[in-house]
Swiss-Prot record:
Purpose: Key enzyme in the regulation of glycerol uptake and metabolism. Catalyzes the phosphorylation of glycerol to yield sn-glycerol 3-phosphate.
HAMAP family: Glycerol_kin (MF_00186)
UniProt-recorded name of the protein: Glycerol kinase
Superkingdom as given in the UniProt entry: Bacteria
Protein activity control: Inhibited by fructose 1,6-bisphosphate (FBP).
Organism the protein comes from: Nocardia farcinica (strain IFM 10152)
Length: 499
């Protein structure tokens, strides 16, 4: 009896294997971190071969620790850091360059050139995305331009491009495939047809021969060829934020989740018709189950939230561990008038200002490190409020029935009760954390399990979801308005630093 489903969660800082039972509960997990490589300011890379070795190790470790074999696992799902870009040799499977990570900004000038006179929105009506260093297409173009002979080899069919899902699947099964959610983050896929857009690929100088096949998020892509799970089907792939949305059972239009990690990523399910934002949000594929129509989402991507706590710890030394920030912030009643805008690599949604850089505003002699700790946490909530406002503006202007009444949350920072209460206060809606915190891996497990009949349908996913903690707003309208006005003033101080 195949009693469990395994998920591989290939993230920005680590790779994990998590095993789930039919109730969506975590049976056990294994995790390995990998190095963050910073060759130059603004550049971020990963060693993809190390990530693959770590994948093999966590698979084996999880099976060994739980005393399971391939006969116990119904299917494997993959979820991954999105946009991180890799090119490898088809014949040897060897990368020709380190993976270029989603946070990397080396393509800033290239993005401007690609936009031309039309600017960042040149391809948005087809891809749902503004031209940005964030997405995979410009990163791929950079590799083709800068690695000797890469373009010629790609045109000859000797090279494969993929995001990290494709890299893991290639090594597990030999198949060169991506799913529609990851493809939707490349800037090379037409959102409506869910196929590679030949004209955009030509504009980017990307040979179609190197692109993976686009498939649904829930189907059998192939069987694992070696290791402790040899013969088990890989049957689900979702980009990490889409996986968290699926794992949070945001399966109906108007349901939204916000993941608090290195950055914040809020997705709002908009149903089977793509909604193109006029207010700085991304339009993306939320998921597609086998041959069913794709479900779309509006997304607000925030670059720096949890990593701001790391900055406070590692760069300023104001705390020695991340979990010290909550008691420090609680030791004062408010932020003392200080606001921190962490535009370390520009501002993502909804402002999209690559010229912005971080500021601390409102400093006086009264401000202590406790006030700064509180300002760090509050900046996450303020940035989330901006995304929610953009979603509301899109819904109103396009007459969509997508009112956000509750926000489901997940990710490491949701353990911070002070932040979650402030988030509820500044949004003026309840904030709900689920019982199962591993929503990203759970979403990938659900996609894989549905494909092989382990779960019978999405009703099973809804039934598995349960609330753990709910925070309700207590802030007055006047206090909320005062905070938001001060925050906006601080954000506007970040503009034009690199112009």
């Amino acid at each position: 009896m195949r009693r469990y489903v395994a998920a591989l969660d290939q993230g920005t800082t680590s790779t994990r294997c998590i095993v789930f039972d039919h109730g969506g509960r975590v049976l056990g997990l294994a995790q390995r971190e990998h190095e963050q490589i910073f060759p130059r300011p603004g550049w971020v890379e990963h060693d993809a071969e190390t990530i693959w070795r770590n994948t093999e190790l966590v698979l084996a470790e999880a099976m060994r620790t739980l005393e399971l074999s391939a006969a116990d696992i119904a299917a494997v799902g993959i979820t991954n850091q999105r946009e991180t870009t890799l090119v490898w040799e088809r014949a040897t499977g060897k990368p020709i360059h380190h993976a270029i990570v989603w946070q990397d900004t080396r393509t800033d000038r290239l993005v401007g050139e690609l936009g031309g006179a039309q600017g960042p929105t040149r391809y948005q009506d087809r891809t749902g995305l503004p031209l940005s260093t964030y997405f995979a297409g410009p990163k791929l173009r950079w590799i083709l331009d800068h690695v000797p002979d890469a373009r010629e080899r790609a045109e000859a069919g000797e090279l494969c491009f993929g995001t990290m899902d494709s890299w893991l699947l290639w090594n597990l099964t030999g198949a060169h495939i991506t799913d529609v959610t990851n493809a939707s983050r490349t800037m090379l896929m037409d959102l409506r047809t869910q196929r590679w857009d030949e004209d955009i690929c030509a504009d980017f100088g990307v040979p179609p021969a190197m692109l993976p096949e686009i498939r649904s998020s829930s189907e059998v892509y192939g069987e694992i060829t070696a290791g402790p799970l040899a013969g088990v089907a890989v049957a689900g792939i979702l980009g990490d934020q889409q996986a968290a949305t699926f794992g949070q059972a945001c399966l109906s239009p108007g349901e939204a989740k916000n993941t608090y990690g290195t950055g914040n990523f809020m997705l709002l399910n908009t149903g089977t018709t793509p909604v193109f934002s006029k207010h700085g949000l991304l339009t993306t594929v939320c998921y597609r189950l086998d041959d069913q129509p794709a479900v779309y989402a509006l997304e607000g991507s925030i670059a720096v939230t949890g990593s701001l706590v790391q900055w406070l710890r590692d760069n300023l030394g104001l705390i020695s561990s991340a979990d010290e920030i909550e008691p420090l912030a609680r030791s004062v009643d408010d932020n003392g008038g200080a606001y921190i805008v962490p535009a370390f690599s520009g501002l993502f949604a909804p402002r999209w200002r690559p010229d912005a850089r971080g500021v601390i505003a409102g400093l006086t002699r009264f401000v202590t490190k406790a006030h700064l700790a509180r300002a760090v946490l509050e900046s996450t909530a303020f940035q989330t409020r901006e995304v929610v406002d953009a979603m509301r503006a899109d819904a109103e202007s396009q007459q969509l029935d997508l009112e956000l009444t509750t926000l489901k949350v997940d990710g490491g920072m949701t353990a911070n009760d002070l932040l979650m209460q402030f988030q509820s206060d500044i949004l003026d809606v309840p904030v709900v954390r689920p019982v199962v915190a591993e929503t990203t891996a759970l979403g990938a497990a659900y996609a894989a399990g549905l494909a092989v009949g382990y779960w019978s349908g999405t009703d099973d996913i809804r039934a598995n979801w349960a609330a753990d903690t709910t925070w309700r707003p207590t802030m007055s309208d006047q206090d909320r308005a005062t905070h938001l006005a001060a925050w906006n003033k601080a954000v506007e101080r970040t503009y034009n630093w690199t112009a």
